[in-house]
Amino acid sequence: MNTPIKPFIAPLISQSELALALRHVEDMRIIAMGDSSVFGVGDHGNDIPSVGFGWTGRIAHDLKAERFVNVAKNGARARHLPTNQLPAVIAYRPHMVLICIGTNDVLRGDFSPEEIRSCLETVCKSAIEIGSLVVMLGLPDPIRTAPGPMALRRILSDRVIIINEILDELAGDGLGIVVPTWNSRIAHERRMWHVDRMHPSALGHQHIADSVRRHLSLPRRSAKKIPTEVNVSKKFEMYWLITNGAKWFAKRSIDLVPALIWLMISENMRKRRSSK
C-alpha cells in the first residue's frame, strides 16, 4: 500500500518575517545540520587536534540560545540530511535551523544537482512546517581557498556555483534564507582558514557567525565572544598538517585519487556534451 505524499502547507509568516520575530525570543532553540564545517572542524583554539564550537556554536553563544544541538557529521553529503539528520530537527522543533552542505558532494564523481536540490527542499519544507527559520550558508569559491591543482579547483568552483544557485532558488521559493560567502573578500582571506585550507579557522568560524547574525539582523546578546586567538607556531601547524594529512591520505587514497581523476575526466565530458 503506497503512502500518500503529504502536501507542503505554506506558513502564514515568511522566513524574513520570522527572522525579525526571533529578535524578541528569549528562550531560543537552535539546531545545526550539515558536514564537518558545521561540526566545528578547524575551530581548534589553542589545541589543533580538537574540534571547537564552530560557527553554529558561536552563533548560539552570541545569541545566548537556551538550547543548542549540533547533528552535523564529518563527510556528510546532501543525501544524508533527510535520512540521518532531519529526524532530530523534527523532534527538537527549533526556532532556527542552520545548514551548510555541499562540499563533499562537489568532490564526488556522482555529483547530482537534482539530488542535492531534492534533499535540501525536503529538509527546508519539513523545518518550515514546524515553524523553524531555515538559514543556509552559501559556499565560498574553491579557486581562492582550496588546495590542489588549478584544474581541479576550477571544476569544484563550477560545481559550487551550481549549489549556490540551488540555495538561491530555494530561498526564492520561500524555503529559507541564504547567507552568501562567494563575494566576500574577507571570507577568502588566508587567516580565515584552517591550515588544511578546507575548513574555517577559529577566526573564520567567528566571522561566519557574525555574518549570519548580521544578515538576519539579530543583535548579539552575549557580553563576551568566544576567543579566536591561536597560540600555535607555524612550524607546529605544518607538522600537524603533514602528520594528520598523511594519515588521512593513507586512509582515503584508495578511493579518493581515482575519484578525483574521474571527476576531472567526467566533468570535461559533461561540458563537451552540453556544448554540442
PLM-predicted stretches and their roles:
Residues 2-74, 84-93:
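Serine-esterase "nucleophile elbow" of acetyl-processing enzymes
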Residues 2-16, 173, 196-276:
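Conserved catalytic region of serine esterases and O-acyltransferases that act on ester linkages
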Residues 43-48, 80, 108-113, 154-155:
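Short, solvent-exposed loop/turn segments at secondary-structure boundaries
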Residues 72, 76, 101-103:
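Cell-envelope and extracellular/periplasmic
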Residues 113-121:
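Charged helix-capping and loop-helix junction motifs
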Residues 129-134, 176:
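A short helix->loop->beta-strand "cap" motif at the edges of active sites that frequently abuts
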Residues 144-181, 202:
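Substrate-gating cap/lid alpha-helix
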